[in-house]
Amino acid sequence: MPHPGFVTHLLEPTPGRLAFALRLSLICALSTYLVERYQTPEPALTAYLVFFLNKPDRGTSLILHAAMVILITVLIAGILFAADVVIDYPFWRLGSMAALSCGLLFLASASRLRPIAATIALIVAYALDLVGSAPAGEVVVRGLLYAWLMVALPAGVSLMVNAILAPSPLRCARLAIAERLELIAHSLESPGSKMAAERERALCEGNQAIAKWLKLAHLERSGDPVERRRLREAAGSSFALLALTERLAPAITRQNAPLCVELVRLLREAAVAIRRGDCPETLRLPLDAVSLAAVTPEARDALLRLAGILSDFGIAPPVVTPAQPARKGFFLPDAFTNPEHRHYAFKTTAAALFCYVTYTLLDWPGIHTCFITCYIVSLGTTGETVEKLGLRLFGCLAGAALGTAAMLWLIPELTSIEALMALVFVGALLAGWIAAGSERIAYAGYQVAFAFFLCVLQGAAPAFDLTIARDRVIGILFGNLVAYLMFTRVWPVSIGQRIDRLLLGVLRQLAAMPRVRGDRERQGRAAEVWGTLATLEKHLDLSRLEPRSIRPPEAALQPRERLLDIIRLLAGNLLFLSDRNARELIRAGRQLEWMADQFDARVVFPRRVSADPPSASAGPDTSRQRPAQLPSGAWIDGPLADLGHTLDELQPMATGDTRAAA
């Protein structure tokens, strides 16, 4: 369950958060100037799109700008063709909305178009809705061309601002590694529960973001190729150091303060060097017999391992051409066998069309946000959908409250575009601070911005129409209700179904750690383990948001939470071993592989059989005997035994659908 300071942590300052929020605010203010100066329609939507077009680094933002302009160009061309066919036929217009929506949402669930297909479905369906309400064909064409301008204008402003102010991907990678080293140094100076939580959050972030930034830096041809390779190695080394600090910090600070001071100095100097673009190849920790004699054997082993990692901190490996991975197909392997993909497309389309028919029959177009809400909040499982419903509801109410207050007390006093830009800047800064935070609350920031802009940007002149905010809020509330009922009553999919499959995956990842050769490869596997653990923790939290009818019982969730703690401990301990401990690694790998097979046979495979009988012809191989429990070292034996005992206690998780079947 989230700890008491969960929300406070999500809102507290983090490196780069304020800078990103300020850039979002500046782009919103400049976009507002242009739409008010040239009186283009839908100024609120133009400003709102800024939040979708920008990311913390320059490289990703520029790619998004180009991709969105190309995408909207292609979509408008397709919609113009479709509009010519269905504009005068309401029945065919509704049918085309349903067919296109179902098809695109199926692709959003079952294909490589997953990141954008749902957005395309929303744009196409809503555009066909607007086509039906237009009084003449020429108005349709002009409206669609203005829609292109609504995307191109903020994209152009974003491109200019990001090209000047946004940090390059290479700089983002440098800062991330330097901040990790600063965190390690601070943990050694002030070990405690707060620092342990910070370290755990940093470990869960893994190296994926750094790897992405370095890849973008390669595409940009920014920085020296040797520096990029050094930074890639430094990312792995700093991750291993972070995991080792969990064990090392309490022992070294109590037993050898001078050595701790020297290590902190070394780490801070390395952080400064990396920030200025001079990643060190090696860091020398002065270890002698006197220093090692002053600590316990456990701490001595950790210090020797630490010194080994520091000595190879940023040594760039020789350039090798990596093997090309096997090309993945366009569709997921279970695209046409798993009914959940079809159910998701049908449920989302049905909810959206119910809202469309409702506000059309009521002749109340102001609540069209209910139609949009169904596409935005609908996700693969009930837990994810309920979380997004809550974020949209909170953001909508908060943004509408801020916007209404501005309409009552601030907008009557505004006398220039510059004053309106200042108001937009402040509102966007508040929303941007939330949007620039954790993904657990970022979407709420988007909704705060949307509701606020709908209130304060109503056209080419100041307006005080409170019915706009009222109708949009009513639409969102109604859309939330329809989506909630649809996803909790019609083919509900509990996120609990994914938990055991992910647990099996992380057990396989853990079993692979001892088998790989080379510390670098083992560090990479450890980062994958922590990334999967972070996903599992999120799924366990989301499962508690689901309705009681499909929620997994608490008695099934608690042992799985204990299992995550054991896996986390064991993954950190495996990093202590190097290739010199080959026998211990082999034994640990065999034990873990056997445990993963047994967990698959007892817990995961029975669930897979009941959910998809055609795939149940061949189960996991359980013919192998349990490996002999030979000693693998003090840090491995204990967690391995705890892991085995906890796995033995687990039974297939019962969610709503399995309880109903029983």
Regions found by a protein language model. Give the residues of each.
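Alpha-helical transmembrane segments and their membrane-interface boundaries
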Residues: 1-156, 160-165, 279-448, 458-481, ...
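Conformationally flexible catalytic loops at phosphate/diphosphate-handling active centers
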Residues: 453
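Long, hydrophobic alpha-helical segments that serve as membrane-spanning/inserting helices
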Residues: 1-25, 37, 58, 138-139, ...
